[in-house]
Amino acid sequence: MAAVGLQKTLGFEILPEVKPGEVEARFTVTEAVAQPYGYCSGGTMLALEETMAGAGSRRIAGEDAMPLGINVSANHVKAVPVGGLVTARATALRTGYRLHVWNVDLFDEAGDLVSTARVTNVIKRRKTAEEH
């Protein structure tokens, strides 16, 4: 799926699926997503974490699925400066019909953990043209 919306605006690259129940991504911290001190903003990291969980839920639940984030809880544990590369891995912890829970970890170029999040998505189904 092509990058759209927030994913495109912030420059997140969701990588092709390697393993079911896992999503990998990367992005370079730019001044556009930095806080005033020259480091990646926490809001940008939260956006990546929720975006990854949504992408993973969509892969699992199918094209008619609309994963909607209903809870995100994160701890940012290390700063990443402008120009730094962030890599990320999301792992599905539970993938029921209506509820998915993901763990998402972000890493800097040295492989150090910079943020960890738990994301819960509710899975809604898109209505078909006949259902409208």
Regions of interest found by a model, annotated:
Residues 1-132:
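Terminal targeting signals and extreme-terminal segments of soluble enzymes
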